[in-house]
Amino acid sequence: MTSQEIEELDLGTKKEEVILTTHNEINQYLNGELLVIEHGYVEVRLRTTPEMVADKHGLIHGGFIFSAADYAAMAAVNETNVVLIASECQFLSPVKLHDEVNIIARVRHKEGRKRNVNVVAFMHDIKVFEGEFKTVILDKHVLKLKLLDENEETAVGTKKKRG
């Protein structure tokens, strides 16, 4: 028996297994490895690699940190058609080659189809990133949506009506 199973027996509780239902095709080598997933909560670990380096000093480009944080936010919401609509982020400390960044994402607020997710990233005990991610859950995949009606399409020149 594992220590978690023993603890669950002692507490009389068993954690429900949560299966990731979004972003299943993502490259975890570049976007972070999903370590823990619970309802509204995930932990991701990003191991920095030479492909992420921005300069000769080994600085990791912030886009990789953001991408891992975004992945964590989407996984915390864990809805098939979740998309990011806005974020406000702070990069608090640099990350370098071979650092491991641990990312924690928690859903903080739910309103209809909207979810706000707080994401923090640490390297050891140093906070390197913090962000608020605003997401929305769509009825279908974002690439399957018809975003413009026929009149708007004609106005922007993407589709011409023939009479």
Regions found by a protein language model. Give the residues of each.
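A short, polar/proline- and glycine-enriched secondary-structure boundary/capping micro-motif
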Residues: 54-58, 85, 140-141
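HotDog/MaoC-like acyl-thioester-processing domains
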Residues: 1-13, 81, 96-97, 108-163
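A generic structural signal for short beta-strands and their flanking turns/coil linkers
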Residues: 28-30, 40-42, 83-87, 99-101, ...
